[in-house]
Amino acid sequence: MTISLKTAPLLEVSNLSVDFRTDGGWINAVDDVNFTLAPRETLGLVGESGSGKSVTALSLLRLHDQRNSRLGGSVRYKGEDLFTLATSRLQQIRGHEIAMVFQDPIHTLNPVLTIGRQIEEGLRLHHGLQGREARKRAIELLDRVRIPDVARRIDEYPHRMSGGQRQRVMIAIAIAGDPKILIADEPTTALDVTVQAQIMELLRNLRDELSMSVILISHDLGLVSEFADRAMVMYAGQPVETGPINKIFDEPLHPYTEGLLSAIPDLDDDLDRLPTIPGSIPEPSRRPPGCRFAPRCTFAQASCVKPQPIMSLTGGRASRCPPRLPTEECVL
């Protein structure tokens, strides 16, 4: 999908930071996150486990425990800053204007309520539907996400369904409020390849039919490349590269992005060992003072010990690694 650069953003995230309280004090988990999301656009958040993707997504709707977390920056939806909104107004937006599909439906769905009751709850809250009217709409939603034998299965409990069916139920709950933005956090985790493809095809169809914007969180670069318009690559709590999905895959600017792409095995190659990025993401309390990827980077230089701000480039691109910009024109 081609998004006009002149389209006003639906969501605008500026200088987002997230800290968590620990026994040793406050620890920063995510910082310096900036991005926009246009109407009907799909943005992929990409990175290894521990890169800050899910922490970023949960913070957009203030879903972290307020007693043990603190948020910085701003998240503006249609001009309203979600970080300063009254709880009553935020509740109107959650699940209605902005909805979320979580990565682990078996732990997200209520085990003591039927799937029908759980869908009807959102319909009552956001649309005022009751009784038969709510049940009829719940059946329509389950049918829309392709749950078979809906009239019977609407009264089943989550544990009676397969992983793929539970994820479809989560999607039905998410779209019940007719959201403008859908956040999908690793929606295909723990599903086999065939079911993964079915879930992604379902999300693609719903996105187009309902004219939604989507934030897709995934460690699977191949999946993101087939679904997203743009990508934001995260490492150790920071974005390290953003840009149109085709540009990121064809001409990665940051060594971490290049490493992720190189780690995708080619089925035509006869490999004794899968390609990997050496090392691991540092713990939040042990991040290096300069470039956070430098200890794992084969291109590291002396200047990498200094903080690396992300630089905006032509073509809607940005990177946190100046040495990897031989052909780009910096606009800062």
UniProtKB/Swiss-Prot annotation:
PROSITE patterns reported in the protein's UniProt record: ABC_TRANSPORTER_1 (PS00211), ABC_TRANSPORTER_2 (PS50893)
Membrane topology: Peripheral membrane protein
Keyword Nucleotide-binding set for record: yes
EC number: 7.4.2.-
Any one GO biological process: protein transport
Residue intervals of the ABC transporter domain: 11-261
GO cellular component entries: plasma membrane
Domain of life: Bacteria
Keywords: ATP-binding, Cell inner membrane, Cell membrane, Membrane, Nucleotide-binding, Peptide transport, Protein transport, Translocase, Transport
Protein's UniProt keywords contain ATP-binding: yes
SUPFAM superfamilies per record: P-loop containing nucleoside triphosphate hydrolases
UniProt-listed InterPro entries: AAA+_ATPase, ABC_Ni/Peptide_Import, ABC_transporter-like_ATP-bd, ABC_transporter-like_CS, Oligopep_ABC_C, P-loop_NTPase
Family according to the record: Belongs to the ABC transporter superfamily.
Role according to the record: Probably part of an ABC transporter complex that could be involved in peptide import. Probably responsible for energy coupling to the transport system.
Name under which the protein is recorded: Putative peptide import ATP-binding protein BMEII0206
Lineage: Bacteria, Pseudomonadati, Pseudomonadota, Alphaproteobacteria, Hyphomicrobiales
